[in-house]
Amino acid sequence: AGKMSIRIERRLDRVFRKIEESTSGDIHPTVRVESGSRIIEIPIKDIVVVQAIKSSHLVDIYTTSQKIRIKETLKNMLEKLGEEFTYVNKSCIVQKRLIREINKKNYFAIMSGGLQVEISYREMRKLVKEQ
């Protein structure tokens, strides 16, 4: 019953987010995450990078102002965040519009705020095509 209720909750979150977006142009869509005992609403526009932590079911969410560690998979985060985000390697997703520079020779991107992320060969080819 646990997995089913989580799936239903996620779908409801998406439905409510779509309703919010369509009813008010000035409301920025948010993603709701749980970090320990806290429930946090993060504006999606503020999320720069989401990085998986090796050998754990945790991810670090880097926003324009803070880092939040939550128990979640990268795949689920990408699903929640939508098409503005993309994988740059198997353990990291970024918000595409916040990529400030791509270094094709050394395979990394510099994000808004100066955060540097590694880009895999495969993802580099996709990113360069999209830019």
Residues covered by each model-derived region:
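Conserved binding/recognition cores within well-folded domains
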Residues: 7-112, 116-118
